Amino acid sequence: MSAALGIVLRPEGQRLAVSLTPPDPLPVAALLLGKPPGQVAELLPRLFNLCGAAQGHAARLALGLPAEAAPARREILRDHLAKLCLIWPKLLGLAPQPLPEHWAEGGAALQHWLWGGAKPADLWPFLTSGQGVAPLLATLGHAFAPGEAVAVLPPLSDPMALTAQENSPAGRVADDPLMRQAEARFGRGPFWRALGRIVDLHAFALAPPAAATPRPGLALVAAARGTYALSARAEAGMVTALSRVTPTDHLLAPCGALALSLASLPAAKAGLAALVIDILDPCVAVSVQELAHA
């Protein structure tokens, strides 16, 4: 029994053989079934350290309760900025920086902070400008060659299916012109995915998170790691069914983004595996073991 995602990397020629052992799932349904809808919507976010606001938002929508998008939006802004300001700089050997002032308000000021001005039309001059997040992106661009640590997956079309799908911030903004430029040069690797966080943050600085209820009892909610799906049913004032599929479920699916990305990382760059994993961002603890050549 383990609450951590186990990852074993072993060199096989120029590439890495990857073995994933998913963590034991938390028995969410067993903990919540038989409780009133309002109580379930309050308890669900408390069961998880990450994306709690998005999960609570999804539960309220699926159960037909009043729902407010502002906490989920703030959560996305905070988590994206933590990557850009604190976590990725450390992994890349750069100095961390404080989150921008008044970040929770979003708006044009946050967009300006990202780019050091207006959002650029051409990605490559921006990378050498030294403005906004350009130094971080430029360093990341030097770390990975085109085609390294890439994963090309079908778009998210069936959020409740436990299959490999592109459920990520980058997938959410894949049609943005900057994203197309990055994909054409690097493929769907760490640079593309990190840029996706930035473009996603630019969008959410002004707009509330997208949420949908395709049918009664099913909610799809934007979260920091992608789209969170939750299905629930209540009868006689009690929740009688509940299931959830997270971006991490799609990430860890057979032939999903995590396995494909690590398998296409050169063995000589195994030291960058921690950065690749953090950019993919599973919402569980991770234990990585690197084995030597046989």
From Swiss-Prot:
Gene (name only): hupK
This protein's name: Hydrogenase expression/formation protein HupK
Protein family: Belongs to the HupK family.
Originating organism: Rhodobacter capsulatus (Rhodopseudomonas capsulata)
Domain of life: Bacteria
